[in-house]
């Protein structure tokens, strides 16, 4: 299981490691089928219903700690087949409301990515596109997203430029979040099919992405150089639901 701490191991085995009771509860709620559950005996006695989700193995607390990436696991880890990337854009003619896509350019911090994914689910984002950056299936992202990543449609691109080109041809407006100089986000028509681009924590968005987009910003005091990417995303994504 320790090989699943790394992207190479996850790719080779096509498995992800779920750590903790909450993620297993999410599997139960979403009717996902883990392939294996490993838990301590104490955890098994407390959660007999969750143990019915998959083949199970009782291990010592020491062995469980070796399996997990966290220092103090809560007594259980499980294996789940890695969800597949989506293959197409939302159909505009079939959508009940204009689709909203979030495209993330090289977001590196797993905590930020997990928060972005959780916020995307709360805001009703239809798809999340990832152009490099942190692996959405690493344990830190899974925990930070509180399992939201298991419910989202994800697409990983070698470069977001190709995806943005396809979206423009499909009548999506392209919105690029920048620190300053953009249109205030509340002036944007969020009722149009939209792709919101957010960039790397330090470098921001690649120039080839901003060149193809309308610039939008979250106005803030000059004493603060920039907002955390997840904070800015939350404000803009929730604007659509006002």
Residue ranges and their predicted role:
Residues 29, 84-181:
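RNA substrate-binding interface of SAM-dependent RNA methyltransferases
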Residues 1-44, 133-134:
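Boundary-proximal intrinsically disordered activation/regulatory segments immediately upstream
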Residues 78, 119-123, 141-149, 207-242:
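Structured adenosyl-cofactor binding patch, chiefly the S-adenosyl-L-methionine
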Residues 175-224:
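Active-site/ligand-binding-proximal alpha/beta "capping" segment
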Residues 46, 134-141, 203-208:
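Short, glycine/polar-rich helix-capping loops at beta-to-alpha or helix-loop-helix junctions
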Residues 53-81:
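Glycine/small-residue-rich loop that forms an oxyanion/phosphate-binding "nest" at active or ligand-binding sites
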Residues 20, 108-115, 226-232:
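Amphipathic alpha-helical repeat scaffolds
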Residues 59-62, 105, 131-132, 153, ...:
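Short beta->alpha connector loops at strand-helix junctions that form conserved
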């Amino acid at each position: 299981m320790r090989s699943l701490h790394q992207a190479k191991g996850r790719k080779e085995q096509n498995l992800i490691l779920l750590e903790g009771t909450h993620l297993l509860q999410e599997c139960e709620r979403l009717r996902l089928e883990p392939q294996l559950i490993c838990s301590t005996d104490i955890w098994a006695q407390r959660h007999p219903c969750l143990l019915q989700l998959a083949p199970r193995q009782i291990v010592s607390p020491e062995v469980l700690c070796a399996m997990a990436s966290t220092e103090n696991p809560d007594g259980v880890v499980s294996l789940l087949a890695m969800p597949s990337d989506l293959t197409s854009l939302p159909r505009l003619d079939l959508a009940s409301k204009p689709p909203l896509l979030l495209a993330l350019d090289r977001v590196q911090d797993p905590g930020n990515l997990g928060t972005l994914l959780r916020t995307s689910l709360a805001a009703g984002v239809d798809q999340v596109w990832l152009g490099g950056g942190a692996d959405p299936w690493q344990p830190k992202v899974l925990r930070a997203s509180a399992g939201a990543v298991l419910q989202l449609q994800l697409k990983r691109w070698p470069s977001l430029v190709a995806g943005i080109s396809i979206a423009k041809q499909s009548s999506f407006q392209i919105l690029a979040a920048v620190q300053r100089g953009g249109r205030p986000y509340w002036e944007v028509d969020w009722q149009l099919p939209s792709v919101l681009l957010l960039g790397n924590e330090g470098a921001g968005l690649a120039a080839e992405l901003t060149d193809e987009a309308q610039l939008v910003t979250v106005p803030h005091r000059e004493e603060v150089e920039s907002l955390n990417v997840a904070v800015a995303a939350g404000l803009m994504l929730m604007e659509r639901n006002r």
